[in-house]
Amino acid sequence: MRSLVDHYIDAYNRMDVDDMLAGVHPDVEFRNISAGVVNASTSGVVELGKLARQSLSLFSERCQRIESFEVQGTLAVASIAFHAVVAGDLPNGLKKGQVLNLSGRSEFEFRDGAISRITDIS
């Protein structure tokens, strides 16, 4: 489990979407929850790939770092430190060059030796 998550995070940090999806189940479910609100969700590896590619242009740099990792049955929970620099002014009020340092957690579920569900919570 940990090696799949490490690979996913490493590829995310390198902005390599194809490699990021290499360890993901074809029927993967993804949700991003911010302040208790689901602001993005996908169903299937194709949709997740589209969202990941669209997100590449949001940040000129980005990095997720795993601060802790715990396995609970088929669920892995990672505490994440996120650092990014906004690439351009965004509709939500973030400005080009603004630095983001956030913390949150990512929950990963697994099926057939692959990541089958990802929930990012901040």
Where do the protein language model's features map onto the residues?
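Absolute protein N-terminus
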Residues: 1-3, 122
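Short, structured helix-loop boundary elements
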Residues: 2, 42-45
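Short, well-ordered alpha-helical segments enriched in acidic and aromatic residues
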Residues: 4, 16-31
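Generic hydrophobic alpha-helical segments
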Residues: 7-8
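An acidic, carboxylate-rich microenvironment
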Residues: 19, 47-50
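A short gly/proline-enriched turn/hairpin at secondary-structure junctions
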Residues: 29-43
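A beta-strand edge to alpha-helix "cap/lid" segment located at domain peripheries
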Residues: 49-122
